[in-house]
Amino acid sequence: MSNPHSSAVIVLAAGAGTRMKSAKQKTLHSIGGRSLLAHSLHAAAGLSPQRIVAVIGHRREQVRPEVEAVAATVDCEISVAIQEQQNGTGHAVQCAMHELEGFEGTVVVTNGDVPLLRSETLRSLVDAHTAVPTAVTVLTMSLSDPTGYGRIVRNDEGEVTAIVEQKDGDEETLKITEVNSGVFAFDAAILRSSLGKLDSNNAQGELYLTDVLSIARTEGHPVRAYRAHDHRELAGVNDRVQLAQAGKILNQRLVEDAMRNGATIVDPDTTWIDSEVTIGRDVIIHPSTQLLGKTSIADNCVIGPDTTLTNMVIDEDAHVIRTHGFDSRIGAHANIGPFTYIRPGTVVGENGKLGGFVEAKNAQIGRGSKVPHLTYIGDATVGEESNIGASSVFVNYDGVNKHHTTIGSHVRTGSDTMFIAPVTVGDGAYSGAGTVIKEDVPAGALVVSGGKQRNIEGWVEKNRPGTPAADAARQAHAHETKEG
């Protein structure tokens, strides 16, 4: 037998997955912020194997970039084997073994559509396989309804003698509730030898990987099973219903992990957390919150309710309420929301504020600066301790190009100020309400752009006679005359 202390992993991801009814290859559908295939590859990488081989075939032009993207993030080599025609799992492993020429050790075979399988379970399988000399160890599970799964057939001593697929089983065999998960640990030398002896004499007319067990046993090699503790880990995803079910189980796992690590999640059923999100201690997450991508929440933050954060960095003690944010950073002790939209490239400094109905895009807000109400701030830099008045607009687009606005420190702008970029407002400057700033404002200046107010008496009664406004004006004038 081979050296049991080295390992390689084969991940099968060549199938068509027609039940998904999708233009996307099955294993590229996502739960928890990762594709099904990425989950499987990361679980495999957790074994620290010498190599991972992903077997791809159907729509491989879609799948190969995903394999390459995962390979760039893990500490082991991942290569690709092509299965030109999908002729069964045995044929898929034959294709993969060309990438493992000369390898001697344990070969783990798993699938690209089992996103809930943990590295720890794979490690337990390998440990069980290598504890004593074994040709094959199959990872099994017990199901109350085993329909569709290959049944584990044992002899009187409890040894595995065969795996019988659903379509090939007789009535007695189909009563067995212990089933094949599709995950195996093989001795590399015995696997290589047995693959050459497979035939397609079965209901599907394919090469079954499971027949390797019968071949190995016939040749006198031991075949064993290791039963998984949680059958949900081994649930395959074949359609959209199963995709949603797996996503819910994964999210429950991630939410519970966050709570066990010191976060308070007020309503776990309405909180969704992606696999690469990090959450600190004493964070409070209110209902209907989604933390997506590589979002990072530092200690003592309050997030939600009704908040979606994607690839956001939230520093300690920040409060983010009813906000949608993407690819940005919120500083320590900052206050965001409610109803705030944060677009990529925005940085809010320590003690900063983006208030109700504020949209920020590619904006750097300095320490202690506030944008409290009803404002669009795009392509802008704001210094420290400045205040942007309500209903202000940073007019950054001329129809062709985007332009930058620079606001200094300790600036106070009146409500309804328009900043026509490119423009700079110096430190300590003020603007009057309704000002349209088209030119640079010196430090310490007060800028106003409106002319003297004119009141045209009687205009409404003269130009809008018979309207409610004219009637109200006439009554007001009559009241003034009576009191006068």
Curated annotation (Swiss-Prot):
Spans annotated as Pyrophosphorylase: 1-240
Compartments where found: Cytoplasm
Matching SUPFAM superfamilies: Nucleotide-diphospho-sugar transferases, Trimeric LpxA-like enzymes
The reaction(s) this protein catalyses: alpha-D-glucosamine 1-phosphate + acetyl-CoA = N-acetyl-alpha-D-glucosamine 1-phosphate + CoA + H(+); N-acetyl-alpha-D-glucosamine 1-phosphate + UTP + H(+) = UDP-N-acetyl-alpha-D-glucosamine + diphosphate
Manner of cofactor binding, per the entry note: Binds 1 Mg(2+) ion per subunit.
Pathway as given in its UniProt record: Nucleotide-sugar biosynthesis; UDP-N-acetyl-alpha-D-glucosamine biosynthesis; N-acetyl-alpha-D-glucosamine 1-phosphate from alpha-D-glucosamine 6-phosphate (route II): step 2/2; Nucleotide-sugar biosynthesis; UDP-N-acetyl-alpha-D-glucosamine biosynthesis; UDP-N-acetyl-alpha-D-glucosamine from N-acetyl-alpha-D-glucosamine 1-phosphate: step 1/1; Bacterial outer membrane biogenesis; LPS lipid A biosynthesis
UniProt-annotated stretches for the region N-acetyltransferase: 262-484
Binding site for acetyl-CoA: 390, 396-397, 415, 433
Top-level division of the source organism's lineage: Bacteria
Enzyme Commission number(s): 2.7.7.23, 2.3.1.157
Region feature (Disordered): 461-484
One Gene Ontology term, aspect cellular component: membrane
Keywords: Acyltransferase, Cell shape, Cell wall biogenesis/degradation, Cytoplasm, Magnesium, Metal-binding, Multifunctional enzyme, Nucleotidyltransferase, Peptidoglycan synthesis, Repeat, Transferase
Catalytic-site annotation from UniProt: 373
GO biological process terms, semicolon-separated: cell morphogenesis; cell wall organization; lipid A biosynthetic process; peptidoglycan biosynthetic process; regulation of cell shape; UDP-N-acetylglucosamine biosynthetic process
Record's function text: Catalyzes the last two sequential reactions in the de novo biosynthetic pathway for UDP-N-acetylglucosamine (UDP-GlcNAc). The C-terminal domain catalyzes the transfer of acetyl group from acetyl coenzyme A to glucosamine-1-phosphate (GlcN-1-P) to produce N-acetylglucosamine-1-phosphate (GlcNAc-1-P), which is converted into UDP-GlcNAc by the transfer of uridine 5-monophosphate (from uridine 5-triphosphate), a reaction catalyzed by the N-terminal domain.
Name of the protein: Bifunctional protein GlmU
Natural source organism: Corynebacterium diphtheriae (strain ATCC 700971 / NCTC 13129 / Biotype gravis)
Protein's gene: glmU
